[in-house]
Amino acid sequence: MTTFTRRGLMALLLTLSAGLHAQTPANPQVKFVTSAGEFVVELAADTAPNTVENFLGYVKSGHYTGTVFHRVINNFMIQGGGYDAKYQEKSTKAPIKHEGVEAKAKGGLRNTMGTLAMARTNNPHSASAQFFINVKDNDFLDHQAPSGQGWGYVAFGKVVSGMDVINKIKQTPTGPGGPFPTDVPQTQVLIQSATLVK
């Protein structure tokens, strides 16, 4: 083997090795510390890679620190990640493409109790930073077809510890708050930090 070929092969191996280390782990975990307690979510990067990458970008930038759970509906879900403690909407990156078709084809997570999904508007490709955690099985939110209500919501993670904290949050009395007429916790639930732990 010539010196040139050896050097080329070594460079290729180093490049591939560096690329492997830069990839997101198959199941990264994020720890949330809130005013109601701590919980950890495990993300499904294998079935919803773009959604997970987007979410981790917000985690790593510190976006979620200082945001609140602004929408809490017992027997449905708790939603946060978009508003600060004064109910001012935080700026976000461009929205991401809905990944429901791909996630479903890969046997991805469904909207069952304890799963994490991206919130969005009526536009299926409008998810950015806001997320919700299902507090019951909400199969009607699952992706069915790429049209109308069939788009559903992409579940991309699940709570692996601290479900008692989620259950505590879901039982918080709600009412009006900021620009919202209903469903706002009357005792504010603040996200103090969100950090990648695995």
Where are these regions (language model features)?
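Conserved phosphate/oxyanion-binding catalytic-loop motifs
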Residues: L9
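Cyclophilin-like peptidyl-prolyl cis-trans isomerases
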Residues: T2-F4, L13, L20-K198
